[in-house]
């Protein structure tokens, strides 16, 4: 039977019989292949697969022996409770292991954007929208007007409030941005802050004295806007700052009318909790309670129509 040499087994290269007797790579004289080489020298009648399986068995046996010794050592250490001091040491080690925290990798902070050239109005507006404070600071340091507006009469303050960029808002107000300026929709910065839903900006503007009951083109107050957009925290803070709970918009709707119509349960509960009037009628003569009944009747009618249509379809399919 033809046998394979260890060199052939490991490298996959065939060697001539003449050279194989005198050639033995240094890598095979020591290390993990040493045992296989010795076995081959002792019994050249064994096949390469026999040598390989023997080698694996030996390695596996050594590994199992090491594991058993390690386990035995751990058990001996655990069972060494000769005094209260030993017990105290074990308890302290367990506490340390439990309290060990994995340190989060330190993220390299991005280098601040360096603005060298002049900042035009378009860049200024874009910076307010994208929260680029260095661009805002450069524009203001170059004596730029913080109250400049676009074709919709919207200022950088309006944009920053709608996007929730608190630091930009603070910088603009510090530079003289007017809080009560209105855009083409006659919305103030507070209207836009309520649309954006950033409570910290709402708090900041109110602390600076902005009108909490300002009206836009539809006669809506910031509270109307907060209720319609579902900004519960902003609405609650406005109410706590004595915003008008029962203010009517152009359609005669109060914030409660809007909350009921839009089926905003949390808003309805909030407004009731703070004492909103449920008897006020809008221009259609409807109170918030009327809207609830109207919604229920509309839903009932919708389901009845759906049921009737299903019955008719099933009846026609029989023919």
Curated annotation (Swiss-Prot):
Q: Where mainly located?
A: nucleus
Segment forming the signal sequence: none
GO CC aspect terms? cytoplasm; nucleus
What keyword terms does UniProt attach to this protein?
Answer: ANK repeat, Nucleus, Repeat
Give its localization: Nucleus
Q: What is this protein's function?
A: May act as a nuclear transcription factor that negatively regulates the expression of cardiac genes.
Q: Which SMART domains match?
A: ANK (SM00248)
Pfam families, alphabetically? Ank_2, Ank_5
Q: Name one GO molecular function term.
A: RNA polymerase II-specific DNA-binding transcription factor binding
Q: Where are ANK repeat segments found? A: 152-181, 185-214, 218-247, 251-280, 284-315
Task: Report residue spans for region: Disordered.
Answer: 1-26, 44-71
Protein name according to UniProt:
Ankyrin repeat domain-containing protein 1
| Compositionally biased spans, kind Basic and acidic residues | 59-71
Cite a single GO BP annotation.
skeletal muscle tissue development
Organism (species): Gallus gallus
Keyword Transmembrane present in the record's keywords: the answer is no
């Amino acid at each position: 039977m033809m046998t394979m040499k260890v060199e052939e087994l490991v490298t996959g290269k065939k060697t001539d019989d003449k050279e194989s007797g005198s050639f033995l790579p240094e890598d095979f004289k020591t290390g993990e292949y040493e045992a296989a080489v010795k076995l081959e020298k002792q019994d050249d009648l064994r096949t390469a697969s026999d040598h390989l399986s023997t080698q694996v068995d030996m390695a596996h046996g050594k590994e199992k022996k090491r594991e058993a010794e390690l386990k035995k050592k751990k058990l001996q250490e655990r069972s060494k409770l000769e005094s209260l001091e030993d017990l105290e040491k074990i308890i302290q080690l367990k506490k340390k292991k439990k309290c060990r925290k994995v340190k989060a990798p330190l993220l390299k902070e991005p280098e601040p954007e360096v603005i060298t050239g002049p900042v035009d109005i378009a860049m200024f507006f874009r910076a307010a929208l994208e929260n680029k404070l260095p661009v805002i600071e450069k524009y203001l340091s170059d004596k730029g007007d913080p109250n400049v507006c676009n074709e919709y009469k919207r200022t950088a303050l309006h944009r920053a409030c709608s996007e929730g960029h608190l630091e930009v808002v603070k910088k603009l107000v510090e530079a003289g941005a007017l809080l009560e300026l209105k855009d083409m929709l006659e919305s103030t910065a507070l209207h836009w802050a309520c649309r954006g839903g950033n409570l910290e900006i709402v708090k900041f503007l109110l602390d600076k004295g902005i009108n909490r009951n300002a009206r836009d083109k539809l006669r809506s107050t910031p509270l109307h806007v907060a209720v319609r957009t579902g900004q519960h925290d902003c609405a609650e803070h406005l109410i706590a700052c004595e915003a008008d709970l029962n203010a009517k918009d152009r359609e005669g709707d109060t914030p409660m009318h809007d909350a009921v119509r839009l089926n905003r349960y949390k808003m309805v509960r909030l407004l009731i909790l703070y004492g909103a009037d449920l008897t006020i009628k809008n221009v259609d003569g409807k109170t918030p309670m009327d809207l609830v009944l109207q919604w229920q009747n509309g839903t009932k009618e919708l389901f009845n129509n759906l049921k009737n249509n299903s019955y008719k379809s099933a009846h026609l399919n029989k023919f």
